């Protein structure tokens, strides 16, 4: 990408935070933002994956910083934003990408520990991150910023995951709309991507310890009946880049954008 192409995106020199940025969609978004000339901070709980991503992406444009952090820990999130402020000043873009899957457990069978963990990562963490991001964005002489929440078809449907994941993504939609409604007039946009089936993620790792047999069977029946087309993480990353800084996207706020080849038009 040439210098003029970088500048045309509007992200050159801007500071972006991508959670879960060391793998899957997060890494693809990180690469796209770096190519646009941004300062990108990634946080991930997987230290080995961070090390591998740094080695892979450090030669690209922009400025890459990586932090190993547990986004469910308030003190670690606070330390993360202190680090960003010390290195770059204020934040321009937050991508709430990090998430965990449940085991397809329905409400009658779910264990409270699993519920608490899924909600902590998928909903409470984005709340905390958005809280500190908004404060940083508002501290600019001319307040501005963009928050992108990575949701799912499970945010609008009931049978694409278990109870915990479904509830967490429905909640993320509410967080998106509330943030957009209150802070839009102050210059901060917040939107959610309603994701379909992606290739290039680590979602399969969620089921290494097994899953709820009947719950998974119900989901598989839906998938086999409708056979959704998959999306590539690089294509989704391009949408995040446009949403963060592309021409005309500055008017988009509080939107739920389906990035799923029409999947949610069938099941959502």
Swiss-Prot record:
Q: Does the keyword Magnesium apply?
A: no
Q: Name one GO molecular function term.
A: oxidoreductase activity
Q: Name one Pfam family in it.
A: adh_short
User: What's this protein's family per the entry?
Assistant: Belongs to the short-chain dehydrogenases/reductases (SDR) family.
Q: Which organism is it from?
A: Colletotrichum higginsianum (strain IMI 349063)
Q: Name one GO biological process term.
A: terpenoid biosynthetic process
What is the documented function of this protein? Short chain dehydrogenase/reductase; part of the gene cluster that mediates the biosynthesis of the diterpenoid pyrones higginsianins A and B. The first step of the pathway is the synthesis of the alpha-pyrone moiety by the polyketide synthase dpchA via condensation of one acetyl-CoA starter unit with 3 malonyl-CoA units and 2 methylations. The alpha-pyrone is then combined with geranylgeranyl pyrophosphate (GGPP) formed by the GGPP synthase dpchD through the action of the prenyltransferase dpchC to yield a linear alpha-pyrone diterpenoid.
Metabolic or biological pathway, per its Swiss-Prot or TrEMBL entry: Secondary metabolite biosynthesis; terpenoid biosynthesis
- What residues form the catalytic site here? 165, 169
What EC number(s) does the entry state?
1.1.1.-
Keywords (A to Z) from UniProt = NADP, Oxidoreductase
Amino-acid positions noted as binding NADP(+) in the UniProt annotation, renumbered to this chain? 18, 70, 97, 131, 165, 169
Q: Return the protein name.
A: Short chain dehydrogenase/reductase dpchG
Q: Which Gene3D superfamilies match?
A: NAD(P)-binding Rossmann-like Domain (3.40.50.720)
Q: How is it used?
A: Diterpenoid pyrones display various biological activities and higginsianin A shows anti-HIV activity.
């Amino acid at each position: 990408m040439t210098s003029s192409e970088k500048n045309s995106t509007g992200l050159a020199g801007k500071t972006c935070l991508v959670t879960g940025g060391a793998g899957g969609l997060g890494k693809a978004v990180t690469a796209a933002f770096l190519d646009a000339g941004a300062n990108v901070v990634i946080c991930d709980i997987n230290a080995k994956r961070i090390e591998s991503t740094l080695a892979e992406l450090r030669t690209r444009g922009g400025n890459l910083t990586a932090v190993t952090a547990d986004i469910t820990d308030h003190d670690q999130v606070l330390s993360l934003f202190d680090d960003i402020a010390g290195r770059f000043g204020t934040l321009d873009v937050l991508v709430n990408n990090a998430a965990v899957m449940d085991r397809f457990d329905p409400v009658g069978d779910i264990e409270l520990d699993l519920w608490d963990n899924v909600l902590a990562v998928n909903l409470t963490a984005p709340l905390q991150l958005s809280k500190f991001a908004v404060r940083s964005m508002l501290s600019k002489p001319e307040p501005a910023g963009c928050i992108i929440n990575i949701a799912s078809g499970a945010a609008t449907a009931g049978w694409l995951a278990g109870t915990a994941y479904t509830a967490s993504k429905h909640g993320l939609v509410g967080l998106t709309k509330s943030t957009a409604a209150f802070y839009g007039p102050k210059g901060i946009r917040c939107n959610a991507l309603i994701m379909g089936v992606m290739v290039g993620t680590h979602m399969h790792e969620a089921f290494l310890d097994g899953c709820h047999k009947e719950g998974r069977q119900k989901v598989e029946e839906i998938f086999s009946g409708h056979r959704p087309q998959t999306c590539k993480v690089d294509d989704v990353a391009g949408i995040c880049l446009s949403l963060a800084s592309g021409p005309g996207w500055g008017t988009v706020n509080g939107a739920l954008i389906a990035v799923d080849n029409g999947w949610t038009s069938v099941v959502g």
